[in-house]
Amino acid sequence: MEAIMKDTYISEAVKYIGADDTTLDLFESQYQIPNGVSYNSYVILDEKVAVMDTIDERKTDANLENVLNGRTVDYLVISHLEPDHAANIKRAADKFPQAQLVLSAKAKAMLPQFFDIAHLEERCLVVKEGDTLELGTHKLHYVMAPMVHWPEVMV
């Protein structure tokens, strides 16, 4: 995969750490994508650090280290378990063992089918419709959106 990191800062505190993959010609083995695909992941740097989804492991480490600048991750937010969003959850969870995994109840139930993460039960922070996670000045408000794409989707 030739994935290209874009050094994109959305704001001083919100950084894009995704990558473009121009070598993929079919998304989910079904949809033609002649220009490739973007894997989207973001970091919010506040009193607490949150990583929103993960991308392909060949790019996650470099992209994440680039913006963390020595800080550690407090929260790994898992919007859903589709591989282009979640492929690197285990690697990130292992690298940041203190990080809580923020996810829906459905995603928590599904997660062990995809990944073997140490101390999973105590690391999960299950959020539901209307919950808020305070990072400092930034607050994440959760909306459950099951079957918008996958059964456990939250935004």
Predicted features along the sequence, with ranges:
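Metallo-beta-lactamase
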Residues: 4-12, 103-154
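Conserved beta-strand hairpin/beta-sheet module of binuclear metal-dependent hydrolase folds
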Residues: 7-66, 155
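Flexible, active-site-proximal loop/turn residues at the rims of small-molecule/cofactor binding pockets
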Residues: 21, 82, 107
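Short glycine-/acidic-enriched loop or helix-start segments at secondary-structure transitions
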Residues: 26-27, 61, 88-89, 112-113, ...
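Short coil/turn connectors at secondary-structure junctions
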Residues: 47-48, 73, 97-98, 120-122, ...
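Short catalytic-loop micro-motif centered on adjacent basic/acidic residues
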Residues: 50-53, 74-78, 142
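Active-site metal-binding motif and surrounding structural segment of the metallo-beta-lactamase
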Residues: 57-102
